[in-house]
Structures are given as C-alpha cells and as structure tokens.
C-alpha cells in the first residue's frame, strides 16, 4: 500500500520526463550515436543534470496543468533537495541512516518504506558523496545556459538541445564554451560562480 501511495499517478507522472523523454532515455539514445568516445567521461553533473534540467524547464513552461500534477512536480523538487541534505550530512557524519529516513518522511512526505529504500539506494550502491548534489548543480548550470542562449534569442530550443546531446558527455563548462564559440586555450578557466567571494579586508 505504501508503494502504491508513494508512486501515485501524479508523483509518477513527474518522473516520466526525467527518466524517459526528454530525460535519460533520449540522452542515452543520442550518446550512443554521437561522439561515443566521450561516454567514458560521463559524470552525474552531465547525466543527472540533463534530466533535472528538464524538470526545471517543464515547470517553468507550465507543463503541470492540474493542482495534483503541480504537487507531484513540487514533491520531486523537495525530494531532490532533501537528497543533497541527507547525502552530504551522512558522509560528513552529521546524520545516521535512520535520521535520513526520518527527514524524508517527516519533512518531505515520503511513505516510510519508500524513504527506507531511497536511503538504502543512496548508501549501499556506488554513488559518491557528491552524486545527489550533482543533479541540482548540473541542472542549474544547464538552466543558466538556456537563459543565456535561448531566452536571449541566440539559439532556438531545438538547436540548443540537439547540440548539447550531440557533444556527448563533456563538462558543462565545455558545452558552454562550444555553444558560445569561445576559444579553448590551455589555461581556460571556468567562470561559474556558486557563491559570493568574500570581500577583501585590505
């Protein structure tokens, strides 16, 4: 019963575009055909970032039409954030597995069996400490790139998404450079900023 409640149609609908099209299924279809030599450089920032980017983009475009479907999408947004909190907290020895489960149940609204399975999946597989954070970091990078290039009219949605997938698994900063026609030099440095640099006290 918990599994049925936790995977109801409104929650499940919100994961379809992450896992299938335009998410991982489309991603894997394209990466098996274009520049396949790059697949060995795959990282969760690119793989999971792509799928989460679509969750964000479809929310922005009003994909969820009913209140129930909006709740389903927001549930997964909360879930992604909670994963970052409990994963990093566990690896920093700030939370136990049971506390991670309780967080998902009490703060996010997971069924307890589903929360237990989620925590087990996170800690008994090969996921690294930053795997869960990579979803959101990669997704936010792609979303920012979409705003820079598509929402300003420099590229169409179709050209933007096709180009990303056809480049296969490379760092998102490299995708950014290629799409913006920046020259890559040996000393090229990323200019992403996820924080504000402390002010100088000189």
Predicted regions and their residues:
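Long, His/Glu/Asp-enriched segments that create or flank divalent metal/ion-associated functional microenvironments
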Residues: 1-202
